[in-house]
């Protein structure tokens, strides 16, 4: 299969190139860029020397429509809104890693992203690519809205409770931490070494754009769920997300009941690993992989549930899940090209 990637020079795009360089069904991978066209890709990314030595090509729809079968869009918000309708008209399958197609209500997207939404018909056609929870729709889709990094960790952590209608409608708190690669490759004051090193900070307080994405999915599973409290923090590490979630339940369950519920829910999900009781995951334990590791426990003193979910933000939170969706869309084993052991230590 001939594959295109727009945004191959960003961190998410680079991970796509790395994964697809050894994917058995990737016949050819064509890399497109709005800048740097003509440059040899591996010269800018020496770790891919011998694996991705092709030249970057300009984004030209007249050429693209004759070159590829599927396009991964790993560009910033706004690019997909412009390109996706053209790609769809050309009969090209699209997997979009930006947030442009995730929020079903255009007004809600514009409120949180502060930009014009994609055409509503395109948004409505897009299937939300949370692979473990939406397999049947993904298998039939031609357009995928790949979930955000925080929503992936949070929704996988809360899905077993939400799908059983067990979440307290007014009490869901998410405290999430991410590595700096989630901010992208472009330099900024907030990601400058001297600003980030030996530091730990909260950002986008009460206005993070992943909030409505999380709420949208939760309300599909458990209608009537109220607004959540979501806080994001930046920590001085390169990769990884840890989402810690606190909630109350609508019925009485023991710690053993909860662990059994999660274990059964994900028993057929290769990439979600529910930890043994009393063992809590660390970001290092999923580094470089497509795994999501989850722990769940009950505080009997407060009767509150704590769920801990960790992912690699560039893999399960972006490129890895995109390739997982690529596999599902084509009827292949979802693990194809993704059986990458976490890098440790």
Swiss-Prot record:
Protein location: Cytoplasm
Annotated catalysed reactions: N-acetyl-L-glutamate 5-semialdehyde + phosphate + NADP(+) = N-acetyl-L-glutamyl 5-phosphate + NADPH + H(+)
Key words, A-Z: Amino-acid biosynthesis, Arginine biosynthesis, Cytoplasm, NADP, Oxidoreductase
CDD domains, per the entry: AGPR_1_C, AGPR_1_N
Disulfide bonds: none
GO cellular component: cytoplasm
Pathway(s) this gene product operates in, as recorded in its UniProt entry: Amino-acid biosynthesis; L-arginine biosynthesis; N(2)-acetyl-L-ornithine from L-glutamate: step 3/4
Protein name: N-acetyl-gamma-glutamyl-phosphate reductase
Classification lineage: Bacteria, Bacillati, Bacillota, Bacilli, Bacillales
């Amino acid at each position: 299969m001939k594959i295109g990637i727009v945004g191959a020079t960003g961190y998410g795009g680079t991970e796509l190139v790395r994964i697809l360089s050894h994917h058995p069904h990737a016949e050819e991978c064509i890399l497109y860029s709005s800048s740097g066209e003509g440059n040899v890709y591996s010269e800018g990314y020496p770790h891919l020397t011998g694996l991705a030595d092709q030249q970057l090509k300009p984004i030209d729809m007249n050429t693209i429509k004759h070159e590829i079968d599927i396009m991964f869009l790993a560009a910033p918000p706004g690019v997909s809104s412009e390109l996706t309708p053209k790609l769809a008209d050309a009969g090209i399958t699209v997997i979009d890693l930006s947030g442009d197609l995730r929020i079903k209500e255009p007004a809600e997207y514009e409120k949180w992203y502060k930009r014009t939404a994609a055409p509503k018909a395109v948004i409505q056609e897009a299937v939300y690519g949370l692979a473990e929870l939406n397999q049947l729709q993904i298998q039939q889709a031609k357009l995928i809205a790949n979930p955000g990094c925080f929503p992936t960790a949070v929704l996988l952590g809360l899905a077993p409770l939400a799908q059983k209608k067990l979440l307290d409608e007014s009490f869901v708190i998410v405290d999430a931490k991410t590595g700096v690669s989630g901010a992208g490759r472009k330099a900024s004051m907030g990601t400058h070494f001297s600003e980030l090193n030996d530091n730990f900070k909260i950002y986008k307080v009460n206005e993070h754009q992943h909030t409505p994405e999380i709420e949208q999915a939760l309300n599909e599973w458990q209608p009537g769920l109220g607004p959540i409290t979501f806080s994001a923090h930046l920590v001085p590490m390169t990769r990884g997300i840890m989402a810690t979630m606190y909630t109350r339940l609508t019925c009485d369950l023991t710690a053993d009941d909860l662990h059994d519920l999660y274990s059964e829910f994900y028993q057929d999900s290769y990439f979600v690993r529910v930890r043994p009781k009393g063992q809590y995951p660390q970001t290092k334990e999923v580094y470089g992989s497509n795994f999501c590791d989850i722990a769940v426990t009950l505080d009997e003193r407060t009767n509150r549930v704590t769920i801990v979910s960790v992912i690699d933000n560039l893999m399960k939170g972006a490129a890895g899940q995109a390739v997982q969706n690529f596999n599902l869309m084509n009827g292949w084993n979802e693990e194809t090209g993704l059986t990458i052991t976490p890098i440790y230590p």
